[in-house]
Amino acid sequence: MHIIKRNGEPQPYMREKIIVAISAAFRSVQNPLAPEVPAIITDLAAEVERQLFEMNRAGVPVHVEKIQDFVEKTLTKYNHSDEVKSFILYRDDRTKKRIAREQIACCFTDSSVLGVLKEIQQDFPFPEYSLDALASKFLLFKKEVTDERRSMQLLIKAAVELTAQEAPQWELIAARLLMLDFSLALGTSLEKLNIHSFYEKITYLEEAGLYGVYIRTHYSRAEIEEAATYLECSRDKLFTYSSLDMILRRYVIRTRAHVPLETPQEMFLGIALHLAMNETQDRMQWVKRFYTVLSKLQVTVATPTLSNARKPFHQLSSCFVDTVPDSLDGIYRSIDNFSQVSKFGGGMGLYFGKVRAVGAPIRGFQGAAGGILRWIKLANDTAVAVDQLGVRQGSVAVYLDVWHKDIPEFLQLRTNNGDDRMKAHDVFPAVCYPDLFWKTVRDNLGASWYLMCPHEILTVKGYALEDFYAEEWEKRYWDCVKDARISKRTIPIKELVRLVLKSVVETGTPFAFYRDHANRANPNGHRGIIYCSNLCTEIAQNMSAINLVSVKITEVDGQKVVVQTTRPGDFVVCNLASLVLSNIDLSDDKELREVVRVAVRALDNVIDLTYYPVPYAQVTNAYYRAIGLGVSGYHHVLAQQGIDWESDEHLAFADRIFERINRAAIEASMTIAREKGAYGCFTGSDWCTGAYFRKRGYVSEDWQRLQREVATHGMRNGYLLAVAPTSSTSIIAGTTAGVDPIMKQYFLEEKKGMLMPRVAPSLSQKTCPLYKSAHAVEQRWSIRAAGLRQRHIDQAQSVNLYITTDFTLKQVLDLYVYAWEVGMKSLYYVRSQSLEIDLCGYCAS
């Protein structure tokens, strides 16, 4: 027997559907069902079925509405009055939903529209997500529009504009509609190109120069076709409108005519194929694991990895840090390095602390040096000029020590007044502070501070002051102060603090780097020193300048060539990814450890697979094998777990979860070392000697066991954890950025000609009180939490401070001192409510 659907199509009769409908009527009255009810339901279904078969034998077509009439009459006949009322209401509700669906679907010829609308009604059954509201707004927008593509865009716009604090899930509904629109357009494009499989798509993209040839070189057709079976299109439902919109606009592969040819899930799979490419054992299993954590939004990779993995130019690393030497060729080499890094989408940190100050001698000529500002302006102009094919200008943070003679002028680089010839508005200044500075500020604000030229110290004393830290640095600093041969620029420390705070309030910068904290905790202090951090202040790794060894003229193939030989120094590279805490079951230690294990493995593979814009980066990366695993969704997970930001419970959570993440990351790196070998300078490191564990007070039996295993097997990665800001990728994951509190629970952003609502993730009556905005949060709670996290993070964190217009300069200063007291290694922006700040996309892992 066949049943006639409402659209006139026949479908096979299924008794189970009748049982489901009757069961729903009974459950609406009594839930759970009484023991005797299932038998009653079976008998009622049999009675309905008997009437249907009689009708069918008589040659009368059986329509779906007739079945519902029979159910209603049968319930009435056997005196199930409450159930009848429920069933009538159910039918009425279904009718209303069907009418709302059809009001929208009739505007489109593709039948998949109706299917998506049905799915939306099933997944969002609450009244505030009724399709009646969507239909009303859509039809109001549509009016005389007949073009189906334009109509679909208006339907999406209607869903987006229905998003509100009281109905935040309209953003998920809008994403479903956006995915439908994208899929329909993509299907048409693929049909024209005669592409019917993932393998055919990769082949076409490769031949078009849009996909790396290395994928098909490393994988057989059978392996790529197996990988295609891993695709889980249902995971597209995890996207919000904002996240899907960003992926489709920025990250899926498009033709040179800007036609998209890749789905979000294929993007994740392509990245997984790239990152697993060099695996020699269980390679396809690693492809699946990488794809799983990416597609389930449990891990986000850095923006360059998301953009460039699987493509011909596969620069996968986020940020680079260079030590600028005190020589003409060295300075220009650093500027050239920055231009190459920027060309391929990386951000840069430049340490200028070795460059001589204004008035220093050059080749014995007194007063000849022009100081660091003219070189910083060169970096500024390079950032503007090398703009990544017009996509965005380069970004560079410039670091200087607080005792450098040029620091007062440096602190005015971006302020609004003063000589514009001394400004560099397109760089991000940052200051490196020793402990002595903050001790003096805290204990004796009336004291003097002595500024000196690093070149002069090197000439007179025979050592570079910046090459020391903590007590040894302090001893040598006072030795230099007392040495009459070294000229000093004396400034009241109060005046220097005033210049810092004035710039911070006006521009949000300079960033702060607490160099003594960073170097005390450096697990590779036996091989060098950390002068500064990177563009987003989360990286803390050994640094040293590139040095020219020789220049020789020789002959190759009968022609004269000039050969330069350089020592590569320690040119820092940041390979970043983030755990999305809100998308991981943190109560399940096995799940957390598995996700961390997969993320660490993927990051370790990035080191061998990335394209290096400069060779010095490749040497350093291969030697230290440094990675930076961080987190996003921090405020989101606090809200999910019912934890107030301003509470001791938050502090306990921060300490506990980061210890677990750290242990899992160390275990993962140690496991890879056992398989592939330890990083180049493991021997003698804090990892090797056990000092890493002792410094952090890791004394439990589990930690002692892990310490012994690390000593035996080594560590694959010299640096492990670093918390990036994740400003872009947190949007993709539908969560909060980094470890910062949210800016607002809800706000409107104008984009593409419409108002885009931005809603705090998982916003509900329960989470609403827990989403206190960043500027309303007592900042000391944020700093205390950061201090507790820092114990478990071998590198640093991108932590912003948020101030209101009510803050005094003294209150801002107190926050800086407090951050130093709790052991933080860096501070990123100070974000005032009256200040617009450009967010960095480079470390958006």
UniProtKB/Swiss-Prot annotation:
The record marks C840, C843 as: Interacts with thioredoxin/glutaredoxin. Belongs to the ribonucleoside diphosphate reductase large chain family. Keywords: Allosteric enzyme, ATP-binding, Deoxyribonucleotide synthesis, Disulfide bond, Nucleotide-binding, Oxidoreductase. This is Ribonucleoside-diphosphate reductase subunit alpha. Disulfide bonds join C319-C574. Pfam families: ATP-cone, Ribonuc_red_lgC, Ribonuc_red_lgN. The lineage of its organism: Bacteria, Pseudomonadati, Spirochaetota, Spirochaetia, Spirochaetales. The record marks Y828, Y829 as: Important for electron transfer. It comes from the Bacteria. Residues 1-98 form the ATP-cone domain. Under complex allosteric control mediated by deoxynucleoside triphosphates and ATP binding. The type of nucleotide bound at the specificity site determines substrate preference. It seems probable that ATP makes the enzyme reduce CDP and UDP, dGTP favors ADP reduction and dTTP favors GDP reduction.
